[in-house]
Amino acid sequence: LWGENAPGLFTKMGEGVVDRLKAIGEKYGYSFSLIKTNTELHGIPQRRMRTFYFFWNTPTVPMLSWKFREKKNLIDYLNEIPEDATHQDMFMVEGKVTDHFKPYEYVLEKEGLTHSEFAAKFKKGTIAQYLEKNELIPDCIKWLEKHYPKRGFSNKKSTKTFIDMLEHQQYKTSQGLGYWDASPHFFHDSFSALIGRNMFNGVHPIENRYLNVREMLHLMGLPLDFGIENPKQVNHIAQNVPVTTAMDMADEVKKFCRGEAKMTNYTFLKQDNTNHKIIDSTEIGTEPKKKYKVKSII
């Protein structure tokens, strides 16, 4: 039995859950192991940290092979998509980035650059971060007051304007607080984890637009003829494991089932594929290391 979970399962935060899983396995005669990995190590330019867990029906666990596949940079990877592939006209956010988020139009005007030129220069980050870092928020607000005083993400009267958003950002940062950043997000060599708002504000590195659904499917390693029936199902893309990441883990399970896995003397093993290190282990016949409980102050 095996599955995939959040990166937190591999950290101190997940120790309680891991201890319970180990106990369940021991009760039914299974050893237990974990491996942490990143989809960038499985041939796809998406930085997606995940944890895989395994219950082995043997007294000890196998040593899983370290995984690494060469990946292309984001631009070259997206360019693999043929012109006739479906879902290239399906977007979470349609239209140009400069039309959807007017402060970005200000940035291009200020820089004197095209979208692709700015993306190559900026490389990674959000427009809100760019404005803050370069101390351009006051000037951008003045520009918006002149050109688009009423514009926001939506044309509804109740929607906050971009001026409101930037003033809110100013206030939050002046208080040393964070803020919700829904501005266009740029990526260079790799995309961030394809989840949540990145599906809405992830910008194409060449074209003045957001990613289309086919590009999202490709970033999950799905076949180029794989489709979805309804735009409302697009978020299902993010609720899965990238294909090559899952494939590499499945190969290890297959080796075990065929009797080809390299077995260890450990009843519990914690491997980190991102740095090829053994983080924790318990040898057969030994007691696990004692853990000291800390009372919560909350």
Q: What kind of feature is each model-predicted range?
A:
Residues H115-I298:
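C-terminal target-recognition/interaction regions appended to catalytic cores
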